[in-house]
Amino acid sequence: MAVDMFAVLADPTRRQVVELLGARPYRAGELSQAVGVSSPAMSRHLRVLLEAGVVTDERTPHDARLRMFRLRPESLAGLQAWLDQIQAHWNEQLGSFKRHVERSLDG
């Protein structure tokens, strides 16, 4: 089953987590504090992101009970490619409209 990245990233808390993880790895507790949600809520958000392949987790070497979460930027490549297509389409449409208006004003 394909992952609906829009559904995964529709939640503002998950988008904030993705932004934070884009800077560096975090433990779940650090993310809870940074975002301002409870630990159980953060666990649910991280589960969604893990299942979608947006983040990975690994045990820390010094304490196997702690997990570090990292962003998988490549997981967002499909979304980025789609957004690039949409942007190119609208750039073309707006350029065409601009040329039409300029011709109308000159004529």
Predicted regions and their residues:
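A cross-family signal for key residues in well-ordered alpha-helices
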Residues: 7, 19, 50, 80, ...
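DNA major-groove recognition helix of helix-turn-helix
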Residues: 46
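Amphipathic alpha-helical dimerization/coiled-coil segments
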Residues: 1, 74-107
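Beta-hairpin "wing" of winged helix-turn-helix
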Residues: 30, 50-65, 70
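N-terminal helix-turn-helix DNA-binding core of bacterial DNA-binding proteins
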Residues: 2-41, 66-77
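Charge-dense, helix-prone N-terminal extensions
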Residues: 27, 38, 55, 99-102
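Intrinsically disordered, low-complexity regions enriched for glutamine and histidine
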Residues: 12-14, 25, 43, 85, ...
